[in-house]
Amino acid sequence: MGKHKDSKRENVLIAAEEVFMKKGLKGARTVEIAQKAGVTHAVLHYWFNTKEELFKVILQRKMMEFRESVLVAFDQAEGPIEKRIEKAVGAHFDFIRSHPGLPRFVVNEVCGNPDTIEPVKEAMASEISDKISNLDIPNAATILSDILSLNLSAFLVAPVIATLGFCSEDEYLDRRRQENIDTILLKLKNSSL
């Protein structure tokens, strides 16, 4: 019985992630999430009292996945700082690519509902700040900001590039991944001169 309950709860989380990624907090409806998950609306609200509570769980999961993908890649990479940053930039890009709705979701929620991400932001900011302060590179916070903006913007622009017929989204993203790594490494090299 416990495993069945756990799998149903996980189905709710999967459905909620899909709906929140497409519609954001304000546009999402718990009735739709319950239907997608194959549970009653009452069961959904038994597990998660409010839509905001469910949203926070999804947001925390996505941020933890993000954290794991980037910080673990950075920590596990061996060698000089350039090699470690190259791995972290690539891991961040790959993480976003495997979660295609995430860039738009992040931009919409950060701009439209900044209060909803505040608790998660504070927890991650302190860990990232600790990681940055341990790096022996000038302007580490700026470089981190550049990594985030370059990688996120690539996924926001990719559909436009494909629609205009310049190349497919996949071709564009394959090229941008390496260009973003090269750009960050060049900036790192120039900041250490």
What residues fall within each predicted segment?
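Short, basic, alpha-helical segments at the C-terminal edge of helix-turn-helix-like DNA-binding modules
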Residues: 30, 60-66
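Short alpha-helical scaffolding segments that buttress acidic/His motifs in well-ordered protein cores
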Residues: 89-92, 106-109, 147, 151, ...
